[in-house]
Amino acid sequence: MTIEQFNFAGKKAFVRVDFNVPLDDNFKITDDTRIRAALPTLRKIIADGGMTIIGSHLGRPKGVAPEFSLRHILPHVSELLGVDVLFADDCIGADAMDKAAKLKAGQVLLLENLRFYAEEEGKPRGLSDDASDEEKAAAKKAVKAAQKEFTQKLASMADCYVNDAFGTAHRAHASTALIADYFDRDHKMFGYLMEKEVKAVERVLHDIKRPFTAIMGGSKVSTKIEIIENLLNKVDNLILTGGMTYTFTKAAGGRIGLSIVEDDKLDLARDIVKKAAEKGVNLILSVDTKVADRFDNDAATQVCSNMEIPDDWMGMDIGPRSIEKFRKVILESKTILWNGPTGVFEFDNFSIGSKAVGEAIVEATANGAFSLVGGGDSVACVNKFGLADKVSYVSTGGGALLEAIEGKTLPGIAAIQG
């Protein structure tokens, strides 16, 4: 069933969204992108005359914690939807059940943070650090049993289930996956955002226009190893950049000064270089780097060879020759995946490389390439430089997107697709 086909008139819909938005010290939303992304789905249900029950998490609470209450975002959700959204001070308690039961056509109810309950994630809480294996096993068994009852209560509020939370699709949580078992195929579906995310990933994985270039940044090669190895079976060009570059440089015998490095991953870096060559993948690493004498926007800087970074200096961004090298490859590409910046883009003096990569992707997109940007830092990059609406798709899912591209089955997607 698709959301477009479904008529919500007279139906109660439990909609799992990802309203895990950043809040400042006064609990004001600093970036409402995730809320806005869910609006088309919520508006469709309202317009049909359905009754909407919104479930989400916020942060990583270890129990009921006022600072993580979804009440903080209630006024903004009401404003964006143009309706007076009701609030339940629990997600499965009497208040939630009562308000859900009394909903009328067009009304919207926001439940309190689902993660106030350990049952949402299905992980025990409150175990002491020195708990025995038996105690851990008993606690896990207890929370799994309680999770079933928790999931049943969430499902009992609604006639249908809509998952529009791609950001948590890689989690087999109560509200993201398990709840789907309580609805038949005709009464569970993706929301519009989830549909777009799934299509974007499928296009990158299965409907590839070549040349296909992946740009992987970030500070650690160890956190990207699975996705890098999966991409080596798919891409024509793999650009590795960001902090992980210096592990490759050191592995090749270069001098990296004070640059970030994973000394225990040098063999892994050499193995990736070898595998790329064996598979005929064009592996592109930076050739020059903008270095600083300290980790500061106002530090003294110079540009030097990647292989010859002075002893007391650290790599902070790619240099002009690397920018030109990356740009040439990107402009020749027809499918582009970007995950991770080229340097410390949060500092304006070291954001030039990331901006240049973003602008090259925009130019390639204008020339007909399909470009997918995903992962927290690269999304922050395109937003910072005003490029988000000039690429093909910006994913809301960090970990979920990476796991999908690694080739893993995402529980939140499998629960709907079967």
Swiss-Prot record:
It is an enzyme of class 2 (transferase). The keyword Membrane does not apply. It comes from the Bacteria. The lineage of its organism: Bacteria, Pseudomonadati, Bacteroidota, Bacteroidia, Bacteroidales. This is Phosphoglycerate kinase. HAMAP family: Phosphoglyc_kinase. Transmembrane segments: none annotated. It catalyses: (2R)-3-phosphoglycerate + ATP = (2R)-3-phospho-glyceroyl phosphate + ADP. One of its GO terms (biological process) is glycolytic process. One of its GO terms (cellular component) is cytosol. ATP binds at residues 224, 315, 346, 375-378.
